[in-house]
Amino acid sequence: MNSDDSITWGELLRVCAAELGSEQEARWLCEHASGLQRGDFDAARDEVVSERCGIALRAMIARRLAGEPLQYVMKSWAFRHLDVMVDNRVLIPRPETEVVVQAAIDLANEMLRKSKPKLRVADLGTGSGVIGLSLASELPRGSTEVWLTDLSADALEVARANLAGSGLINSDVRIVQGSWFAALPSELKNSFDLIVSNPPYIGVYDPSVEVSVRNYEPHLALFAGSDGLDAYREIIAQAGEWLVTDGWLVLEIGHQQGDSVRELLAQNKFEQIEIRQDLAGRDRIAIAKI
């Protein structure tokens, strides 16, 4: 993309679409560089692009053409009802995780309907915070205390930024650092009604991992031992110490891990074990009661 002092946003959009091979990506990046939302951007198509906006857009196009994920280039992404900040300190939120969140919300609402006055929920390995913040924002206000944990201090900086941007800053959301349950105060054992996690679940030698994922996303959030099950082993083994009687565990799983995770849950005395599918019909969610 060459500099042109007289180029309009409409013309620049066409140039970017040709370079990227995607009109949708070009539009997102042009809107992001201009600082305009969709309707306002359409109204500004005949306006000349400022030098500052042109420089910013050229930098983003170069990063995208080098293979960097679009979400990191834009440093933002939509997840359910949230617009969140994302960068290479955290895993990119994916549509499959939205289905996991919905399963957790449905369970939480069912518990609230059964006259449970207030729920305590943990989002283990929160990353950008999208699971826990979605629960806090979509469940009735004041009904839920949500704990977000992560081993990575860098990831928690992103989660805190997303908490601040969510409008939930004065709500019952706690952000704590540590590995899985080690982040939580010991006095909270046997007090969580619901524990949710999207842990790393890719085997370190898995050849199917996309190049952009392996090159750009944090490996701590992706890989879990040779078979991808190490995080599940740890979480499932300890979850019973933290859940209340009849508490629920909800896990995002890899599409080929349903049987293995079911077996781990059964070995640790979980009941009502269910493996649910995502919108593509692949195993994606493990749900179980202690």
In which residue ranges do the predicted regions lie?
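Conserved SAM/SAH cofactor-binding pocket of Class I
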Residues: V99-S208
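Mobile active-site "lid"/loop adjacent to the S-adenosyl-L-methionine
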Residues: P200-A231
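Residue-level signal for inorganic ion chemistry
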Residues: L29, G67, T97, I131, ...
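Short conserved AdoMet
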Residues: G21, P140-R141, V244
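Conserved Class I SAM-dependent methyltransferase catalytic core
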Residues: S226-A288
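Non-catalytic accessory regions of SAM-dependent methyltransferases
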Residues: M1-V49
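Conserved AdoMet
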Residues: W28-L107
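Active-site beta-alpha loop architecture of Rossmann-like, nucleotide-cofactor-dependent enzymes
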Residues: Q71, I202-Y205, Q256
